[in-house]
Amino acid sequence: MMKVSVIVPIYNAASTIQACIESILNQSEDDLELILVDDGSTDESGAICDTYIEKDQRVRVIHQKNKGRTAARWAGVQQSSGEWITFVDADDMLPVDALQALCKGINDDTDIVFGNGYSLSPETRISIPIEEFRHLAVRADGMIGVPWGSLYRRTVVTEYLFDLPRHIMMGEDYIYWLRLVFATEKPVSIVYERVYDKGDDHTSNIFEWTSDYCYELNEYRKSAVPVDYQDIYFDDMLSDRIANLFAVSVCRNRKEWINSRFYQEILTDLKIHHKSFSFKQRFFLAFPSLKLRAFIAKNLL
């Protein structure tokens, strides 16, 4: 069996896909297959991908109607054969030793090799117990919440991870991670070397967050945590919702923010569990003045 399957979902990435492909094929760890999923591109992306089929036998190309990035990733998983799976976005690149560094974290006692260890702390622990890592994942600490830059054992990468409606196109990676960390009981291996070079995510540049979207996204996030674990991770889940509210509220007008289901649900939960949260968090939510929110976010949080 191939060691690593690298899956790249592609949509109208003609200006970046060649550099992305070259960075993968030039890896020092060459026991890999590269699966390029052309998700209905209307530019030259698909044609560029096809030129690599004859150049390198490790390359496979899938052409499909446009279904969105999440569906494209799952299509790649279905056609892959590697024992381990990783994802790369079409506008990103891998440092030459990225896969080699990640593969050093592979062992029989892990299903996940987390390659963004530098984002958690300066520590050099080689693994983190799954219970502790779940707390980090639910709070979205560091770079947890992005599918790239890590390895996943094939047995835990199931269709359930990608089962989302197409319009959930921002924040969906976090749902993937939450579902993933509750699909294994094994410790998570940690890699601290640089394993990913991020490009520009043009989708995030044009996406407009709304309070209704935040509410729906949060419903999927909550459902990703199994019912038996909801009480254990409640504080972490609420902290993450507050953090998300801080992040998007500067773009919302005061009336919409105060009246939104997303805000009201957070406020209700915070009142019930107020002892678990800081004065700053409670004060921020209690006084939703735009100027006050901006001041607190800048100077206190």
Where are these regions (language model features)?
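A conserved acidic beta->alpha catalytic loop
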Residues: 23, 38-47
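Membrane-interface aromatic/basic loop that binds lipid-linked glycans or pyrophosphate carriers
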Residues: 251-301
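Glycine-rich, basic loop-to-helix element that forms the pyrophosphate-binding segment
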Residues: 64-80
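Short, acidic, metal-binding catalytic loop of nucleotide-sugar glycosyltransferases
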Residues: 22-31
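Conserved nucleotide-sugar donor-binding catalytic segment
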Residues: 134-213
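Catalytic core of nucleotide-sugar-dependent glycosyltransferases
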Residues: 185, 194-201, 206-270
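Flexible acidic/His/Gly-enriched loops in nucleotide-sugar-dependent glycosyltransferase catalytic domains
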Residues: 95-163
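Short aromatic/hydrophobic "clamp" motif used to bind/position activated sugar donors
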Residues: 85
